[in-house]
Amino acid sequence: MRRAEVQRTTLETMINVEFTMDGNGEFSGTSGLGFFDHMLTLFCKFGGFNLNLSCQGDLEVDDHHTVEDIGLVLGEAFSKALGDKKGIARFASGFYPMDEALMLIAVDISGRPYLAFEADFPPVLAGKFNYQMVEEFLRGFVQKAGITLHVREISGKNLHHKAEAIFKGLGRTLKVAVSVQGDELPSTKGVI
C-alpha cells in the first residue's frame, strides 16, 4: 500500500498528515480554515486519496503559514507514499470546468519541483482563507512532492469556482499520473 505519515513542527505550525495514495477519496481532520478544508476534500475525492490532517497554526496572524506548511507536509507525504515510482504513468493533464471557470492542469512526476501558475486570484477572503494562498499551497506541495505542475486559467470569474476547478483537477490529474501501468521506471535516464 502506498502510504506515508509526515509531521512538521515549527514556531508557527504543528502539522501531522497521514496520506494514502490508493484510498477511497476521504478527507478527515481540519486545517482550521473551512474553505481550505473544502478544497482538500475535493482534492482527495477526485484523486482517490485518503488524507487525515491534524493542524495547529498561527491563524491569529493570518492563513499563510498554515496553508503553505500544509502544502509542504502533504507534498512530502505524497513523495514518500509514491515510493520508487516504478511503473507509474508519470505524465497527465486535463481541462477541468466548474461552471464558467476552466483550468488546464498538467503534471510531470519528474523529481524536478517547478510550478507554473497562471491564474488570477486577488487578495480576497473566503471566510479566513485568502484566495492568494491557492498558489502558495501549490508551491509548497510541488517543492516537497518533487513534481512539475502547470496551472493555467482558461476562463473564469467566480473565485470559488476557479479554486474548485484547480483542486478537483489537481486530484484527478495526479490520480492518472500515479497510476501503475507497468513495472519499469518511466525515464530514459533511469532515475526520477
Swiss-Prot record:
It holds the Pfam family IGPD. PANTHER family: IMIDAZOLEGLYCEROL-PHOSPHATE DEHYDRATASE, IMIDAZOLEGLYCEROL-PHOSPHATE DEHYDRATASE HIS7. Coiled coil: none annotated. Keywords: Amino-acid biosynthesis, Cytoplasm, Histidine biosynthesis, Lyase. GO terms for biological process: L-histidine biosynthetic process. NCBIfam families: PRK00951.2-1 (NF002111), PRK00951.2-4 (NF002114). It is an enzyme of class 4 (lyase). The gene is hisB. Its main location: cytoplasm. It is found in: Cytoplasm. This is Imidazoleglycerol-phosphate dehydratase. Belongs to the imidazoleglycerol-phosphate dehydratase family. It comes from the Bacteria. Pathway: Amino-acid biosynthesis; L-histidine biosynthesis; L-histidine from 5-phospho-alpha-D-ribose 1-diphosphate: step 6/9. Its EC number is 4.2.1.19. GO terms for cellular component: cytoplasm.
